[in-house]
Structure formats: C-alpha cells, structure tokens
Amino acid sequence: MNIFEGKLIAEGLKVGIIVGRFNEFIGSKLLDGALDGFKRHGVNVEDIDVAWVPGAFEMPLIAKKMAKSPKYDAVICLGAVIKGSTSHYDYVCSEVSKGIANVSLETGKPVMFGVLTTNNIEQAIERAGTKAGNKGYECAVGAIEMANLIKEL
C-alpha cells in the first residue's frame, strides 16, 4: 500500500493570491494571515504575487488566469461576503464557490477557497484572525500541502 501526503515544506513554490477589495478591511487581514503562513513554511516573498479584484464575484476569472500559468504552483482566493437583507448574498456565494472549484478541476492546480461567507461582520472579523484563527493562514498551509501532494502523485 502506498500512502501519499503533501509535505508542508514550501521552498521553491510559487503562489498567487487573489484578494477582493470589497470588505477590504477583512481581506487585508486574510492576506496578512496568508503571507504569514507562506513565509513560515519557506515561500520566498519574491515567489508570491498578489492580485486585487473588485469583489468575490471577479475572483474565478483571475484564479483561472493564474492557475493556467506555469508560473504558479497554487492559487488562493481571499475575501468576505457578508449577508445583507437581499438574496444577492446567496447568488454571489454560490457562483464564487462553484467558479473557484471549477478552476481547480479544469487546471489541475490547487485553488483554495478563502472567501468568508458570514451572516454578519462579527463572524467575518472572528475568522480573519481575532478569535477563530485566520482563514488566510489556513488556506496558505492547505495550498502548500496540495501543491506538494500533486507533485508527489
């Protein structure tokens, strides 16, 4: 029996990070967490590219562009969609999550979903590093593991 597990050593990996500008104060905290995660695991700052997009809905297009490039081993998408009083939230969350998943399946590269989908601002703040960890950091570690696992298989 063979067992494969992605290593958490990131030296030599090149990564793309996409951050939504909408709810930027949350996106910035998620970005800080992701950068910390990549640096702690050995990614050189020069091997990290950050692309800012208007909001979560625009992420799948840029994720596809990055993932199709041989330059990147992994891509992470970071941002926050916070529920309001209309159904807009449901449409955005659904399309963004499907779009990001499709990019990963189409390109064969890990594209991590670090878009917080919360009922209120307090939940978003908690998941951006104040109480419940930092989803950006978690996505960075997940991207490292998946990129290495793909190389191993």
Swiss-Prot record:
Q: Where are the active-site residues found?
A: H88 (proton donor)
Enzyme class, first EC level, given as a word: transferase
User: What InterPro entries does this protein map onto?
Assistant: LS, LS/RS, LS/RS_sf
One GO term of the biological process aspect: riboflavin biosynthetic process
Q: In which pathway does it act?
A: Cofactor biosynthesis; riboflavin biosynthesis; riboflavin from 2-hydroxy-3-oxobutyl phosphate and 5-amino-6-(D-ribitylamino)uracil: step 1/2
In terms of Pfam families, this protein maps to: DMRL_synthase
List the keywords (alphabetical): Riboflavin biosynthesis, Transferase
The residues that the entry says bind 5-amino-6-(D-ribitylamino)uracil are F22, A56, F57, E58, A80, V81, I82, F113
The answer to keyword Transferase applying to this record is yes
Question: What reaction does this enzyme carry out catalytically?
Answer: (2S)-2-hydroxy-3-oxobutyl phosphate + 5-amino-6-(D-ribitylamino)uracil = 6,7-dimethyl-8-(1-D-ribityl)lumazine + phosphate + 2 H2O + H(+)
Molecular function GO labels: 6,7-dimethyl-8-ribityllumazine synthase activity
Gene Ontology CC annotations of this record: cytosol; riboflavin synthase complex
- Domain of life, per lineage: Bacteria
EC number(s): the record gives 2.5.1.78
Quote the record's binding site residues for (2S)-2-hydroxy-3-oxobutyl phosphate: S85, T86, R127
- Which HAMAP family does the record match to this protein? Lumazine_synth
Query: What is this protein for, i.e. what is its function?
Result: Catalyzes the formation of 6,7-dimethyl-8-ribityllumazine by condensation of 5-amino-6-(D-ribitylamino)uracil with 3,4-dihydroxy-2-butanone 4-phosphate. This is the penultimate step in the biosynthesis of riboflavin.
Tell me its family. Belongs to the DMRL synthase family.
Q: What is this protein called?
A: 6,7-dimethyl-8-ribityllumazine synthase
What organism does the record attribute this protein to?
A: Clostridium botulinum (strain Eklund 17B / Type B)
Upper classification of the source organism reads:
Bacteria, Bacillati, Bacillota, Clostridia, Eubacteriales
